[in-house]
Amino acid sequence: MATNNANYRIKTIKDGCTAEELFRGDGLTYNDFIILPGFIDFGAADVNISGQFTKRIRLHIPIVSSPMDTITENEMAKTMALMGGVGVLHNNCTVERQVEMVKSVKAYRNGFISKPKSVPPNTPISNIIRIKEEKGISGILVTENGDPHGKLLGIVCTKDIDYVKNKDTPVSAVMTRREKMTVERAPIQLEEAMDVLNRSRYGYLPIVNENDEVVNLCSRRDAVRARDYPHSTLDKSGRLICAAATSTRPEDKRRVAALADVGVDVLVLDSSQGNTIYQIAFIKWVKSTYPHLEVVAGNVVTQDQAKNLIDAGADGIRIGMGSGSICITQEVLACGRPQGTAVYKVAQYCASRGVPCTADGGLRQVGDICKALAIGANCAMLGGMLSGTTETPGEYFFKGGVRLKVYRGMGSLEAMSQGKESGKRYLSENEAVQVAQGVSGNVVDKGSAAKLIAYVSKGLQQSAQDIGEISFDAIREKMYAGQVLFSRRSPTAQGEGGVHSLHSYEKKLFAAKM
């Protein structure tokens, strides 16, 4: 049966064009072509849509939120990582502000807490209240000497101190004592520890050694998040993966040092034209100074641009120049490339070098994301599609009875006046006259980004199913082998492929049972 199915997959009749033939002539974008269907012998739920973001980081959902100041701050970055993607924190702010955002993301979901907050038994309750307010934690370990890895005596939680009137009372008088606590002995796997927490009624699970000394700690909050978001993008310690943008000027080395200190996982070098001596030198410096950090370089639209950045040590490449919905680089500067052609050409070269690439710009709907992944991109970066969601920065406002949010390009005059870093992206931060390469506008409230990403995920699975492949890795492999076929679309065909011939209609993209 399997052999017969394999035979059904092989395209023996040349009906359509290969990707190489499709992109041989004029520059194309996503709406200019369509993917031809293949043979289906599996369910959509079986499709693996995961993609490589950098050499070492793979995303369960190959979606990255753009480092724009109206798209990605800590709330969006948390949501993206929880859902299985990753968010790139914008850098149009002070170093200190960006560092705080990274800390917020990294602290949102812990695996093992290696240095849990601990106090000695004579600590007054007033100190516990202060620590809880400053750190935002509800449970504090009590150890023999206050050392995070000292002998465990007990734990003090909010319920233990809420009704104690004398705030000078020592925690030893109100804490839950060691003999009444649920603990586990090291070594233990994180999944086992989370399972114990799920089955117990306690908020925290200390892990101790044979001397009853604290090794680390697990919290119920993190166990619940692990249960509710089983495909989260995590680091080796079980914390959410976090990426952050930076420019490539010498003074940006201080920003990188500060980000590295608080545990950022990926640096995204943010430039509209990445093939510069500044970025090449910056990549080399980062990889030699912080070899554990992954570096995504760009933006590029040609193979030569990508080659220079990969030669410098880039762990990932970002593709796109002037194709975003709020970007006017191509019309103002007459420089760029149609995004479909850019993705195919650059991704082809990146694949030959074993470096993942991310398509950035021109993605208006799930079909565009599918096309980008099918012609070579490993991941897709979203800005406009995520704009107006609850997790984006900024407040909603009403105009004409419609609930809106601001969405602007980082090359807009508004963004460049907000912070110097936006100007650095376009190599114009010190210019007396700044040429806008983006616009600012308003977008309609789209609800939760979590629901939108879930919709994108399901849409990608169904797209791959129609193409007839079990994963996008398989689609790309077959595409390069000429076994995934395409067709050009005329303007009339594009109109035919959309909604037409109706007096009126309401376009709902998904119905969420969440």
UniProtKB/Swiss-Prot annotation:
Catalysed transformations (reactions): IMP + NAD(+) + H2O = XMP + NADH + H(+)
GO BP terms, alphabetized: GMP biosynthetic process; GTP biosynthetic process
Subcellular locations according to the entry: Glycosome
Binding site for NAD(+): 270-272, 320-322
Regulation: Mycophenolic acid (MPA) is a non-competitive inhibitor that prevents formation of the closed enzyme conformation by binding to the same site as the amobile flap. In contrast, mizoribine monophosphate (MZP) is a competitive inhibitor that induces the closed conformation. MPA is a potent inhibitor of mammalian IMPDHs but a poor inhibitor of the bacterial enzymes. MZP is a more potent inhibitor of bacterial IMPDH. Potently inhibited by MPA. Inhibited by XMP and GMP.
Cofactor(s) listed: K(+)
Gene3D superfamilies hit by this protein: Aldolase class I (3.20.20.70)
Pathway of action: Purine metabolism; XMP biosynthesis via de novo pathway; XMP from IMP: step 1/1
Enzyme Commission number, as recorded: 1.1.1.205
Molecular function terms, GO-annotated: IMP dehydrogenase activity; metal ion binding; nucleotide binding
Enzyme active site: 327, 425
Residues that hold K(+) according to the record: 322, 324, 327, 496-498
GO terms for cellular component: glycosome
Binding-site positions, IMP: 325, 360-362, 383-384, 407-411, 437
Quaternary data: Heterotetramer. Interacts with glycosomal protein sorting receptor PEX5.
Protein name per Swiss-Prot or TrEMBL: Inosine-5'-monophosphate dehydrogenase
The species this protein was found in: Leishmania donovani
